[in-house]
Curated annotation (Swiss-Prot):
This is Urease subunit gamma. SUPFAM superfamilies: Urease, gamma-subunit. GO terms for biological process: urea catabolic process. It catalyses: urea + 2 H2O + H(+) = hydrogencarbonate + 2 NH4(+). Belongs to the urease gamma subunit family. It comes from Alteromonas mediterranea (strain DSM 17117 / CIP 110805 / LMG 28347 / Deep ecotype). Its EC number is 3.5.1.5. Heterotrimer of UreA (gamma), UreB (beta) and UreC (alpha) subunits. Three heterotrimers associate to form the active enzyme.
Length: 100
C-alpha cells in the first residue's frame, strides 16, 4: 500500500493516540508524544464528524488534565496546532493551554 507522507503521519498519530487512550483507561500517565497524539486525534476526528473549528478549540482544552500526564508535560505543551479536514475544507486548529 502506497501512502502519501501526510497519510503516514495521520496513521502514526492515530496509532499513538490509541495507545494513549488505552493507557488513560488503565490510569497510566501520558508522556509528551502520547499527550500530543491523543489531543491531535480527538481534533482530527471531531473535524471529520462535522464539528466547527471553534468547537474543536474549546473541546481541545477539556481532553487532558495535569493529573493525567507525567510531571512537566503540561508545561511542554503551551499550545497544539492540528491541521484537520472539516466539511468545508482543511483548516488549522490551535489550542492554547490544552492541559489544565
Amino acid at each position: 500500500m502506497d501512502l502519501l507522507p501526510r497519510e503516514r503521519d495521520k496513521l502514526l498519530i492515530f496509532t499513538a493516540a490509541l495507545l494513549a487512550e488505552r493507557r488513560l483507561k488503565r490510569g497510566v500517565k501520558l508522556n509528551y508524544p502520547e499527550a500530543m497524539a491523543y489531543i491531535s486525534m480527538e481534533i482530527i476526528e471531531g473535524a471529520r464528524d462535522g464539528k466547527t473549528v471553534a468547537e474543536m478549540m474549546d473541546y481541545g482544552r477539556t481532553l487532558l488534565t495535569k493529573e493525567q500526564v507525567m510531571e512537566g508535560v503540561s508545561e511542554l505543551i503551551p499550545e497544539v496546532q492540528v491541521e484537520a479536514t472539516f466539511p468545508d475544507g482543511t483548516k488549522l486548529v490551535t489550542i492554547h493551554n490544552p492541559i489544565i
